[in-house]
């Protein structure tokens, strides 16, 4: 069982707080790599998480993803697209689909942002919030 908290930290910005580094990385891996993977076989494509793990492992001499990344961020709409074409392959997919349903019921216009962090009190949180505010707040963007 993955222990997490879900909190709307700013209007339309949702933080998924997962203390366990491995669980956090695995929960966010599929949508994050769908959003901005450097490998065109995964970015904006349906992919098996097992194919991604194999590719990442070969590229990095082992599957170090949970140790390489501590924070995650992407637009809600991207995660929705990702999970609309991806089949559930593990408990993390199942949980993330449930998180998306919860967020969908909270959004007014289907536009939002999701961040994945260990806590709401560290540099990673502040960094991920910069991405979220840039996306959701025109005053923050300066436009």
Regions found by a protein language model. Name each.
Residues 22-23, 120-121, 139-140:
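Short, solvent-exposed loop/turn segments at secondary-structure junctions
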Residues 111-126:
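Short pre-active-site segment immediately N-terminal to the catalytic Zn-binding motif
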Residues 135-143:
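Post-HExxH zinc-binding segment in Zn-dependent metallohydrolases
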Residues 1-112:
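A metal-dependent hydrolase signature that marks the N-terminal structural subdomain at the beginning
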Residues 123-136:
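Active-site recognition of the HExxH zinc-binding catalytic motif
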């Amino acid at each position: 069982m993955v222990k997490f908290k879900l909190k709307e930290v700013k209007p339309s910005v949702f933080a998924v707080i997962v203390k366990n580094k491995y669980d956090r990385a695995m929960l966010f891996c599929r949508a994050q790599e769908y959003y901005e993977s450097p490998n065109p076989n995964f970015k904006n494509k349906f992919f098996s998480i097992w194919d991604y793990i194999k590719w990442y492992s070969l590229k990095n001499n082992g599957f170090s993803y949970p140790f390489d990344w501590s924070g995650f961020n992407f637009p809600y709409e991207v995660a929705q697209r990702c999970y609309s074409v991806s089949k559930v392959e593990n408990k993390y997919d199942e949980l993330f689909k449930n998180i998306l349903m919860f967020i969908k019921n909270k959004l007014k216009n289907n536009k939002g942002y999701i961040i994945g962090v260990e806590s709401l009190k560290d540099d990673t949180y502040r960094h991920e919030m910069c991405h979220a505010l840039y996306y959701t707040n025109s005053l923050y963007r300066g436009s």
